[in-house]
Amino acid sequence: MKHSEADSDSAPPSSEGLYIALFSLHGLVRADRWELGRDADTGGQIRYVVEMARALGEHPKVDRVDLITRQIIDPRVDEAYAHARETISDKVALHRIPFGPRRYLYKEKLWPYLDFFVDQMIAFFRRQGRVPDILHAHYADAGQAAGQLARILGIPFVFTGHSLGRVKRERLLAQGKSAEEIEERYALRTRVEAEEYALETASMVVASTFQEVEDQYQHYDHYVPERMEVIPPGVDLSSFSTDLSADEHPAVRERISRFLDDPSKPMILTMARPDERKNLEQLIHVYGQSPELRERANLALILGHRDDIREMAPAQPRIKQRLLVLIDTYDLSGQISYPKPQ
């Protein structure tokens, strides 16, 4: 990880090149060593925004990128999330802005504090002596705040929803949950209103697929097809190698191999946080019911970051328990590895 600077969020202003500010307000965000899968708020969006910020910083027309998230001061999480500033690369910095209680909050609890975040950002940009050329907000909470700031500052705003409240409500209703239960747990009415506001005010809306545009955004009142841009997520090719002889992480291999009778077999690797939508139980069913797969390959399950299973979000231990029951039912001991990620 690059060095952190907790004492200053200032940087010398420059008139050369674009200044882009990215907002990703919920979850646990840091420059690297992401705790992906720790909870529902700390998932793929974290890596998406950090790698996007880093990639934007490498563009020759970009002078500066600030990734803005929430400052968290809470003994239950790493002290890194309390640092006011963290360097990602030469032109890219992560800034943590305090708003709401100091403790870690799930995204559903952040809505009452977004107006204060807007005030904090106006003060932040004033201290910089420079207003961004573009705001890019990720998820509904950031979209609501960025929409307000875009109107106040008179600058364009790009919105990426990542997931949408209307779609989530339909899925939960289909699972048999009541409207009252859904609203109490997920505050979807507030979220959908924020998404509508973001769609109304955004100059451009980024989706990952055409299906996302046609089957999800199209259900919104402020859906404007001309503003939609489909930009599939990129991939960091430096993470991959064709040198099969290199074993750069022997400790990782050892943690996976210790569960297996024959570690030399090819591996089916699955990485996901324990969530109903990931359909992990069906994966175990398919593997367990296939003698050919079991003969030819091992199965490895990397199920998100955790320090203590007793402190995980309530649904996650239940999912893990169901997976363990299936592993026992199909007698997969020695063929499946489920190490504790670190």
Show the residue positions of the predicted features:
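Catalytic cores of nucleotide-sugar-dependent glycosyltransferases that transfer UDP/GDP/TDP-activated
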Residues: M1-Q342
